[in-house]
């Protein structure tokens, strides 16, 4: 989705992407 939680998970999975 596009929720804040999703963004948080992405950052945790790949900090480089953050």
Swiss-Prot record:
Keyword Thylakoid: no
Thermal behaviour (record text): Thermostable.
Keyword line: Antimicrobial, Fungicide
Top-level taxon: Eukaryota
Tissues expressing the protein: Leaves.
GO biological process, alphabetically ordered: defense response to fungus; killing of cells of another organism
Ranges in coiled-coil conformation: none
Other noteworthy facts: Resistant to heat and proteolysis.
Biological role stated in the UniProt entry: Has antifungal activity against the plant fungal pathogens G.graminis, P.infestans, P.megasperma and S.sclerotiorum. Does not have antifungal activity against the human pathogen C.albicans. Does not have ribonuclease activity.
Protein name: 30 kDa antifungal protein
Organism encoding this protein: Engelmannia peristenia
């Amino acid at each position: 989705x596009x929720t804040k939680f999703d963004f948080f998970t992405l950052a945790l999975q790949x900090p480089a992407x953050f």
